[in-house]
Design a protein with these regions (language model features):
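Periplasmic/extracellular, small/polar-rich flexible segments of pilin-like filament-forming proteins
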Residues: 62-166
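N-terminal alpha-helical signal peptides/signal-anchor transmembrane segments
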Residues: 46-64
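Short beta-to-alpha loop/turn elements within the nucleotide-binding domains of ABC transporters
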Residues: 11, 29, 41
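N-terminal leader/signal peptides at the extreme start of proteins
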Residues: 1-14
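Membrane-proximal amphipathic alpha-helices
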Residues: 36-50
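Alpha-helical hydrophobic helix detector
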Residues: 17-30
Length: 166
């Protein structure tokens, strides 16, 4: 008598469940990291719009020895007219540049109604005159007589700041 042996082909149900569990674990790590990547890319748009704004502030400072109080003083359009896909406005306030950003859902919670703010402030240093340096994002302890001009209104979570801002 001849007995046929069946060879198992394909995957069993338990093996498939393990594969699905592993994919789920990988996705739970990858999706939040991808969200951080997307928001950092969106913040980068602000730095594309920034050079003419910084130039206007520096030009005003070079001519007057003071910093512009607002967009109009710096000969720039109104804050709401300087926008991009993720930048809703760029406002100058006493020399500081405040960029309002609209970002997609953040891990820390819901986005504020008005958006997140990233402040770029000029730094005055007697040794560096006539040049201006720019301080981005978080407050940094500066050694006297060096001082940052304007108020830091940054509300953007640190993880979304470009590496040169941290």
């Amino acid at each position: 008598m001849h007995v046929m042996q069946c060879k198992q082909t394909g995957f069993t149900f338990i093996e498939l469940m393990f594969v699905i569990a592993i994919i789920g674990i990988l996705a739970s790590v990858a999706i939040p990291q991808y969200q951080v990547y997307l928001n950092r890319a969106r913040v980068a748009e602000a730095f594309i719009l920034l050079p003419p704004i910084k130039k206007a502030v520096a030009t005003y400072y070079a001519h007057t020895g003071e910093f512009p109080t607002d967009n109009h003083a710096a000969a720039l359009p109104a804050a709401s007219l300087i926008r991009g896909d993720y930048v809703s406005q760029i406002q100058i306030e006493h020399g500081a540049i405040h960029i309002t950003l609209k970002l997609s859902s953040l891990a820390e919670g819901a986005q504020p109604e008005q958006g997140f703010i990233l402040s770029i402030r000029p730094v005055q240093s007697p040794e560096a005159l006539p040049y201006l340096y720019w301080l981005c994002g978080e407050d940094t302890q500066l050694v006297a007589p060096t001082k940052a001009v304007g108020e830091n209104k940054t509300t953007l979570p640190t993880q979304y700041l470009p590496s040169h801002c941290v």
